[in-house]
Amino acid sequence: MCGIVGLIDIVEGSVSPRLLDTMRDVMIQRGPDGEGHYLDGAVAMAMRRLSIIDIESGAQPFFSREGNVVAFQNGEIYNYRALRERLKARRYRFISESDTEVLAHGFTEWGIDGLLERLDGMYAIAILDRTEQELHLARDRFGEKPLFYTHAKGRFAYSSSLLALAALDWVSDEIDGESMDRYLALHYVPGDATIFKAIKRVLAGERLVISTSDPAPRRHRYYTLRLGDEKKTSDRELAAMVEEAVSSRLVADVPVGVFLSGGLDSSVIAAIAANKQPHISTFSMGFDSTSHDESRYAKTVAKTIGSNHHHFHFDEESFRSLLPLVASALDEPVGDQAQLPLYWLCKEARRHVTVALSGEGADEIFAGYDYYKRHATAVTWLNKLGARVGRSSAAESSPARLIDNPEPVTPSGFPLLTDVAGRQRLAGANRAEITEWEEGLMGWLDRSADSLQRAAATDMATWLPDDLMVKFDRMSMAHSLEGRAPYLTPLVVATGLALPPSEKLNGATSKVALRRIAGRWLAPEIVERPKQGFVLPMGKWLAQWFDAEGSGREYFIARAVPGLDMTEVARVTADDLSAGVRRERLLFAMLLLVEWYQSFKSRQRELSRRYREAATAAHSEHVPITGSK
């Protein structure tokens, strides 16, 4: 696990080594154990390293045998050992046990597309082809690892950190009004956009090619979920896939643990992991209210599988102390309440392990969310999208069968999703039009006639990479903890999405196929228990937060976020507080947005100052073309 960063600057013709170092060290929490760089004229690349595999010899960059390919990576390639053996059979010589070295030789042997199609992992990759003078960037299939980029005439920059780019003097930090509109609707910014106009996100399953002589990115999709297939898989085959996925995610040269909520998904992972590594550490979080607390089930599972279990408590005082810390850990706003206890859990787990496995992805793959059960009666995605962007005739001009319910909670959880007027009052005239990415999304979804498959696929393309994995990555990396999601294995995802609807839902029972195979490892009490969901007493906590600030109105009036009418935000908050906090998700999303923006601007100002100092330092200092430690 690392953080990567790089620049191409043909305007200046070179990159200040001190500037590169400063950009790299923005990500020190992503990689506190080491660093590496590559400098050659107008091209500069660097990384911070969290040592997980081959602690002694895994420093980056890695080169091909001829030295013409330079490889950096953030993440893990889980099938690197199999790829390594194939390359060794082709007479490639390895000098380490690092998975990143496989990328350098694999690129030489198979090219970028051939390499990417062979990878099972979570990654953001940067590979420089010195022969063709091209930089290749790629992000993993399901968006587990972040990768941002920006470009202007003669300049291109990329990073695992959005902040590292936003502080560059040639990058505008203007808030994107359409992104603000989407945040108010969804509580995250989906797709290739970010909250800033000038900074884009590499999509999950996307790669970029950038010429070092003309650094304008060319975008290519190398992976798209296959829709339309329907295939039943035997319990034996599915169980073997899940077991192999967990086993591959246990590979590390540092201690590994499991986040154990007590629900089905994490319990399956913990049980398999405990079979592979007896007495493995497991971690759970509890709450004051029994209606929100699954910890008793987590303790039951931990006792059954014999894990070394650690339990932590989260309450209102934790909320008050952690909200500013969570906001500071984010480089983009995500209004997801669950990241608060997750931040705490990651902090405590890091005292015991360096890697933690979690159950992200299972609800999307095997249809675990409650709203999937109501998909047949939900309004269509297309109608919602049409309402959100103010196109009431959208359903008439496009196929009406696209999808039934994209959001991972009931519509009441996102009160502004279809309320265009409400969002316009909060954010002025920033009404978003349908983007090229959304048009492509709708066309892709139309390949499947199975509305349940389309609902899950929508979540896999939006909610999963742009909320769940952002939350998981940022909260874990804030504590230099590597988070891994075993269900997000290409074979498990493809197999799960292709299962017939009856293998996912049967009346009130969700995740039918996963529950059946879970009986191999877990007691019926856990296997048969309905999904509880992750719900915090946020309404009460928000009321207490704003009381401590004087009032909701006073809090928002005293703070400013470009693109938001703070007077209207204050009015909405005051009205909702007086009514008993009916729209707690919206209030939390607005509170998080404000806390994030205040923190981000403070960090950006300080980083910009450090960039200026670095840029004015003597360019004549001798810096090796490559280095690591």
Predicted features and spans:
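Generic hydrophobic alpha-helical membrane-span motif
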Residues: 37-39, 146-149, 268-271, 365, ...
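Short low-complexity, flexible loop/linker segments enriched in glycine and/or proline
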Residues: 324-328, 350, 373-374, 541-543
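Cysteine-centered catalytic environments shared across enzyme families
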Residues: 1-330, 342, 346, 519-520, ...
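Adenosyl-5′-phosphate
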Residues: 1-4, 21-22, 167, 176, ...
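Acceptor-substrate binding/catalytic loop of class I
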Residues: 332-336
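Short acidic/histidine-rich active-site segments
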Residues: 353-369
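A mobile, often basic/glycine-rich helix-loop segment
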Residues: 365-392
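Conserved A3 ("GATE") glycine/threonine-rich loop of ANL adenylate-forming enzymes
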Residues: 99-102, 124, 363-364, 389-393
